[in-house]
Amino acid sequence: MLKHGNLEYEIIIGCEIHCQLLTKTKAFCSCENRYGGIPNTRVCPCCLGLPGALPRVSKEYVEFGIKAGHALGCRINNFSKFDRKHYFYPDLVKGYQITQFYTPLCEEGEVEVNLAAQNEEPKFKKIRIERIHLEEDVGKSLHIEGSHSYIDFNRSGVPLIEIVSKPDMSTPDEAAKYMQTIREILKFIGVTDGNMEEGALRCDANVNLKIIDNGVEFRTPISEIKNMNSFKAVKDACTYEVSRQLEEYNSKDRIAFKTGFKRTMGWDEPSGQTVVQRTKTIAEDYRFMPEPDLRALELSDKFIKEVSDSVGELPEAKRLRFKKEYHLSEFDVQTLTSERELAEWFEEAAKKSSSPKKCANWILAEVLAILNETNSSLSDLKFGPEAIAELVNVIEEGKITSKQAKDVFAEMIACGKKPSAVIAEKGMEQVSDSSFIEKIVEEVFAENAEAVQDWKNGKTNVAGWLMGQVMKKSGGKANPKQAADLVNKRLTE
């Protein structure tokens, strides 16, 4: 229990996440499903709600819903159906939204949310998922300065899933990390791009408190904070709403606390406050009714299994395997499995390398740094994972030093050449011929007899200087380890 003055309280948060899916077409028509474009150009009679236009379900839409349900640990129902949700708003052109109210596609899931800070050992909390249902997005209202508003119906009919959690989150940070986990999983399996700036992932958070006041339990009314499109917004809005409800309780203004009272709030980021949009004392009547123009979804066990199996290895399973198989740290695996492309890129390099750990180090320290610096992606690189594996291998074989490897990597970035080609062109390859190195060591010792005597008189730092002279005389080609061993051997003779 948390403390606020003389009160003890618990925070209760549940989330409803709306996620746009990356299907080729819209949910119930053949219009292109792509963000943006000239307003009202990716539309047809169906998504404009014209009389007589009949919807038809996209098979890919259903498949993506199954994939999401499988990835989030849900039971996929063999039977589900569509319903109409009626309300009146300018961007809802039909006057109703096609959704799944009574029988959703997916139910009873759960996700493990890692609550630990970066570089800490994982600390997981299980968040239950009540349901995932299919529904269509609505148009986009554009409020221009002046007396007019415009509506872009390109977004009307875009396929969504709504993921409804149980009220299992007990801090604003948990709510933000839950949303982050959902985004990571759904991006990883390829059903969404998760671009929150474009509205591909939006969160409604239901927040209230259980307060113990002098031994008596009291629950504040639920506030539903709508349409948050960033992790920071979720955390900040829930944090503010908790403090607002505590202050309201302490004000003893209990008129607003009557049974069934509920507020719909918006998050005003500039002011850092939640703002009341509407209040209601009874459940909102959306006049749900079965969608008469769409058949129920009747899915065979075989079809559900085939679609579920196509998802492949999920991020958490991949993390555990990477730690065990490649002996990587928690930080390494968290980063490498943050996106499927990165995980597959690393694994392809690891399988061709003598040191998967060093491959991981190069990818995390050098490759990702370049991508961040240039705001590019792995697909933009002029070389593939096999080149990183080759670079690590030549370092491990002693053909070049780690310092030389940085120069080779720079050439790979600029030209896309193989490490072996860069090494050959620049004459970088180290010489491991012991007779060649011994000859150079003898020459250095003969030319620097005074320095050798200084070492014998106790100036041990001279050994490093002599080593530098050997490397200089060899043009940087002498194998450093062999050279160091021979210098030390010669000094102790």
Curated annotation (Swiss-Prot):
InterPro entries assigned: Asn/Gln-tRNA_amidoTrfase_suB/E, Asn/Gln-tRNA_Trfase_suB/E_cat, Asn/Gln_amidotransferase, Asn/Gln_tRNA_amidoTrase-B-like, GatB, GatB_C_1, GatB_Yqey_C_2, Gln-tRNA_amidoTrfase_suB_CS
Keyword presence, Nucleotide-binding: yes
EC number: 6.3.5.-
UniProt-listed Gene3D superfamilies: 1.10.10.410, GatB domain, N-terminal subdomain
PROSITE patterns registered for this protein in UniProt: GATB (PS01234)
Keywords linked to the UniProt accession: ATP-binding, Ligase, Nucleotide-binding, Protein biosynthesis
GO-annotated molecular function: asparaginyl-tRNA synthase (glutamine-hydrolyzing) activity; ATP binding; glutaminyl-tRNA synthase (glutamine-hydrolyzing) activity
Catalysed reaction equations from the record: L-glutamyl-tRNA(Gln) + L-glutamine + ATP + H2O = L-glutaminyl-tRNA(Gln) + L-glutamate + ADP + phosphate + H(+); L-aspartyl-tRNA(Asn) + L-glutamine + ATP + H2O = L-asparaginyl-tRNA(Asn) + L-glutamate + ADP + phosphate + 2 H(+)
Highest taxon listed in the record's lineage: Bacteria
Region (Disordered): 473-493
An example Gene Ontology biological process: translation
Pfam families found in the cross-reference section: GatB_N, GatB_Yqey
Family: Belongs to the GatB/GatE family. GatB subfamily.
Quaternary structure annotation from Swiss-Prot or TrEMBL: Heterotrimer of A, B and C subunits.
UniProt function note: Allows the formation of correctly charged Asn-tRNA(Asn) or Gln-tRNA(Gln) through the transamidation of misacylated Asp-tRNA(Asn) or Glu-tRNA(Gln) in organisms which lack either or both of asparaginyl-tRNA or glutaminyl-tRNA synthetases. The reaction takes place in the presence of glutamine and ATP through an activated phospho-Asp-tRNA(Asn) or phospho-Glu-tRNA(Gln).
Protein's recorded name: Aspartyl/glutamyl-tRNA(Asn/Gln) amidotransferase subunit B
Gene: gatB
